[in-house]
Structures are given as C-alpha cells and as structure tokens.
Amino acid sequence: MSHDRRLTVGSLLPNQPRPVAVPKAPSVVQPSKQPLPEKAIIRLEQNGRSFSVRHVKGNLLTEGLSQGLPLQYKCRKGTCGVCTVKVTDGASRLSLPNQQEHKKLQGNIKSGFRLACQANME
C-alpha cells in the first residue's frame, strides 16, 4: 500500500496547524469605471449644438463620428467647410491649423473655429 502523504518533522508534532494551499488570485486587470478626466475631452460646437469628443490620437471628425456624435461633414478634404466647428475647450490638444484651414476659415481660426476633417488630436 503506498501513501501519497509525506511525513515531515512538523507533521509529526501533535496539535500543529496543517498548511492549507491558497489559490492564486487571477492577474487580470479590470478596466477602470472612472469617468475620463476633463483634460481628455475636446468640447466643440457646430450649428448651435454642443459636443464632447473623448481625446484619442487621431482625426477630430473621424474620432467624433466613431464615438457616435452626429457631426456634419461632406468632403473630408477641407474644401467644403461643412465640418466647421468651434472648439470651446481643449484646443491645445489639437494640431495647429493647416494651410487648408487657413484658406477656408481665414480669420475665424483666431475665434476658435476649425475644420474637423483637418484637425488632429495629438
């Protein structure tokens, strides 16, 4: 008859607690349910409506649409101006206006207007 139990000095002592195997906790990191910090939001207005775009690296129009925002647009090339938005918060997190924006928006850039199809979040 074979025994799987090993005898040790400690196991031979009476009234000694027996070691218990503790299962390891899984090392899966749960995503945080906390709201995004304010600095991670770009706030803008278009045609009298206000929108908040979560800041991720990429094009402002493309990311806004992928986040379910009903932003108006047409050409995506910066020529029609339909995607013009006024950035009310977070402008410093956007790329500098490019030549196409300067041409289409002229002096309105100083008032916070951008072409969403040309502005990139950095």
Curated annotation (Swiss-Prot):
[2Fe-2S] cluster binds at residues 75, 80, 83, 117. It is found in: Encapsulin nanocompartment. Residues 1-33 are annotated as: Disordered. Binds 1 2Fe-2S cluster. One of its GO terms (cellular component) is encapsulin nanocompartment. Residues 8-14 are annotated as: Targeting peptide. One of its GO terms (biological process) is intracellular iron ion homeostasis. Pfam families: Fer2. Its cofactor is [2Fe-2S] cluster. GO terms for molecular function: 2 iron, 2 sulfur cluster binding; metal ion binding. Keywords: 2Fe-2S, Encapsulin nanocompartment, Iron, Iron storage, Iron-sulfur, Metal-binding. Belongs to the 2Fe2S plant-type ferredoxin family. This is Ferredoxin. InterPro entries: 2Fe-2S_ferredoxin-like_sf, 2Fe-2S_ferredoxin-type, 2Fe2S_fd_BS, Beta-grasp_dom_sf. The N-terminus (targeting peptide) is probably responsible for targeting to the encapsulin nanocompartment. Residues 40-122 form the 2Fe-2S ferredoxin-type domain. Cargo protein of a type 1 encapsulin nanocompartment. An iron-binding protein probably involved in iron mineralization in the encapsulin nanocompartment. 2 different cargo proteins have been identified (IMEF and Fer); when both are expressed in E.coli with the shell protein only IMEF is detected within the nanocompartment. E.coli expressing all 3 genes stores the largest amount of iron and is protected from Fe/H2O2-induced oxidative stress.
